[in-house]
Curated annotation (Swiss-Prot):
The gene is rpsK. This is Small ribosomal subunit protein uS11. GO terms for molecular function: rRNA binding; structural constituent of ribosome. Located on the platform of the 30S subunit, it bridges several disparate RNA helices of the 16S rRNA. Forms part of the Shine-Dalgarno cleft in the 70S ribosome. It comes from Erwinia tasmaniensis (strain DSM 17950 / CFBP 7177 / CIP 109463 / NCPPB 4357 / Et1/99). One of its GO terms (cellular component) is ribonucleoprotein complex.
C-alpha cells in the first residue's frame, strides 16, 4: 500500500519592523547576528563563513562582507530599524556598522557591550615572538 504524499508546509516568515544586530568582533573573527527585540535569532554570518581564512578573517573588509551577508539573510523579515550592540575589541567593529547602514537599515542606537572585568581573572602573559 502506497503512502500518501507528504506535503511540505511553507514556512511563514514573521514580519519584524525592529531588530537588534549583535556584533562580536574579536581579534581573530567577526560574528554578526540579527535578532528580533526578544532575542530570537533571525540570521547570522561570520567572516570565516564568508570565505575568509587565516589572518584575512580578522580584517575590516571580512567583517563588512559578513555584515552584508547577514543583512541579505534577514531582508525577508522586513526589518527597517536596527539597534547595534558591539562586543569586543576587534578590527571589524566600525566596518560592520557601516555595512549595515549601507544595506538599507536605519540604525537607531549603537551600544558597546564589551565585558570589562572588575579585576577578575588574571590576563594571559605577554607574547614573546
Amino acid at each position: 500500500m502506497a503512502k500518501a504524499p507528504v506535503r511540505a508546509r511553507k514556512r511563514v516568515r514573521k514580519q519584524v519592523s525592529d531588530g537588534v544586530a549583535h556584533v562580536h568582533a574579536s581579534f581573530n573573527n567577526t560574528i554578526v547576528t540579527i535578532t528580533d527585540r526578544q532575542g530570537n535569532a533571525l540570521g547570522w554570518a561570520t567572516a570565516g563563513g564568508s570565505g575568509f581564512r587565516g589572518s584575512r578573517k580578522s580584517t575590516p573588509f571580512a567583517a563588512q562582507v559578513a555584515a552584508e551577508r547577514c543583512a541579505e539573510a534577514v531582508k525577508d523579515y522586513g526589518i527597517k530599524n536596527l539597534e547595534v550592540m558591539v562586543k569586543g575589541p576587534g578590527p571589524g567593529r566600525e566596518s560592520t556598522i557601516r555595512a549595515l547602514n549601507a544595506a538599507g537599515f536605519r540604525i537607531t542606537n549603537i551600544t558597546d557591550v564589551t565585558p570589562i572585568p572588575h579585576n577578575g581573572c588574571r590576563p594571559p602573559k605577554k607574547r614573546r615572538v
